[in-house]
Amino acid sequence: MRQLKGKPKKETSKDKKERKQAMQEARQQITTVVLPTLAVVVLLIVVFVYVATRPTITE
């Protein structure tokens, strides 16, 4: 049967399995890449704010 333009094709079980695999890999990347990077950025901000606002001792 000819596929008409603009209508999405019906998702096969193979397509569904590939999509689920891609989503699983994306979730795994979130925990292995995004969270440690975010933790480093937050740590840098905290250190910067601490250094910028610490009291200085003048003699």
UniProtKB/Swiss-Prot annotation:
It comes from the Eukaryota. Residues 9-22 have a biased composition (Basic and acidic residues). The keyword Transmembrane helix applies. It is found in: Membrane. The keyword Acetylation does not apply. The chain crosses the membrane at residues 32-52. One of its GO terms (cellular component) is membrane. Residues 1-23 are annotated as: Disordered. Residues 9-31 form a coiled coil. Keywords: Coiled coil, Membrane, Transmembrane, Transmembrane helix. InterPro entries: DUF4519. This is Single-pass membrane and coiled-coil domain-containing protein 4. The gene is SMCO4.
